[in-house]
Amino acid sequence: MPRSVNHVASRAKRKRILKLTRGYFGARKNVWTVAKNTWEKGLTYAYRDRKSKKRNFRALWIQRINAAARLEGMSYSRLMGALHANGIEINRKVLADLAMNHPEAFRAIVAKVKN
């Protein structure tokens, strides 16, 4: 009895991976083994960068808050300490947005915690 191989499924799997690697440079787009390795490496980069995106955005928000707070004569750490001491629960993302897009609202918050 001849060996049973499922060529239909094998071909479909290869086509699926090669379709996902369309647009890559050189052999990465059309050579099966290279494309498969590139695709798998891309998945690891995506996983890693989903984690680092959170760190990067937090650092960006802190930089923006610090810059805006220093314009008001207060450092970032003193501002955050004063916010917590006054029981104002506002997260860094919103504070950074206020600092960039609504400076008058940010100024009002800083004035409230300065007193």
Curated annotation (Swiss-Prot):
InterPro entries xref list: Ribosomal_bL20, RIBOSOMAL_L20_CS, Ribosomal_protein_bL20_C
GO BP annotations listed: ribosomal large subunit assembly; translation
Q: In which domain of life is the source organism classified?
A: Bacteria
Give the UniProt keywords, A-Z. Answer: Ribonucleoprotein, Ribosomal protein, RNA-binding, rRNA-binding
The molecular function terms of the Gene Ontology recorded here are: rRNA binding; structural constituent of ribosome
Any Pfam family the entry gives = Ribosomal_L20
Give the UniProt entry's GO cellular component terms.
Answer: ribonucleoprotein complex; ribosome
Q: What does this protein do?
A: Binds directly to 23S ribosomal RNA and is necessary for the in vitro assembly process of the 50S ribosomal subunit. It is not involved in the protein synthesizing functions of that subunit.
Query: What family name appears in the similarity comment?
Result: Belongs to the bacterial ribosomal protein bL20 family.
- The protein in question is named Large ribosomal subunit protein bL20
Q: Which organism is it from?
A: Porphyromonas gingivalis (strain ATCC BAA-308 / W83)
